[in-house]
């Protein structure tokens, strides 16, 4: 019996919550009005209710324990190793905690928002504008479900394994060759480029027209300048000039790489290279289109965005698409007409609503530290775990921007600039 008790005490148990009032066995505590027979602890589960000097055996016949001068003698019956409790089955059933108790509210998993074309039905009455997206506090955020939109862009190497989604297995990239050429070349496969965007709002007119600087992060806190961008002052729509020369942000500068231009409502942005629109020798090429869902009625929730990119060839070269060519279609026209053979369609990853923090959260793996409506991650429907690009705030004027294949630094920077621009129909 002692060995059995020691084994029970050594076995780790699980404490379960229950509202039942447990009927505790007799003990030295709260024993007023009871007849105490000097047996306490596990021994009382084995004794007969009528005679405390009798032990109930498995056969039901009592075994009397008599103390003598030389030891203990037993009469009638035998003692077995498994004692039988004098309590009835109904009492034992009452003592047993229910295994059908519902989960605690704290352990209930957070529901994942389904992927859709708009977050309108997930609006929160306390939010007045687009809800900011917060970085997840842990790395075990549930992965959101992504719906297949049917895009058939020839992005052949996006179907990577999920361990590469967070970039832990990817090598950190560096500039290869002249900076003017590197910023427009597609990223190497299996390489993650970690960048930082700094917004400079100091000066006479930089409150309305700040300058954005893109730096590639290196070891030991070092950074390498890559690109700079600024909105043109005299333009009917938002028009950003992007250059490798931070001192000369004009289309005539030698470092001019391309531009970002929006429509009147600020819902669609077009990214072009430094080619000329009507030049047959060096025509202007479409590098990206960023589409934000309109939100005219003031619905709340994160901004939903679609990014269109030129497809990739077998030798990892970008397909040339010229929207100014009368004989061809641009990225936006191809997407509208469902001609997706040479178009790659990306979407922002669906955030998860967290009731505890009252915000939408995404797992940025430590690269984003502040909540912002500008925070986003771009994925392809064929592999939602492969994060093509992520962008988010770390301080008031500092943002991180990480990208990988098939994007180039110029495309990623232009997509990030579109997030900075004001959108009348999206707020």
From Swiss-Prot:
It is found in: Cytoplasm; Nucleus. GO terms for biological process: protein localization to cilium. Residues 48-174 are annotated as: Disordered. Pfam families: Tub (PF01167). InterPro entries: Tubby-like_C, Tubby_C, Tubby_C_CS. PROSITE patterns: TUB_1, TUB_2. GO terms for cellular component: cilium; cytoplasm; nucleus. Residues 57-86 have a biased composition (Low complexity). Keywords: Cytoplasm, Nucleus. Gene3D superfamilies: Tubby Protein, Chain A. Disulfide bonds: none annotated. Belongs to the TUB family. This is Protein king tubby 1. It comes from Culex quinquefasciatus.
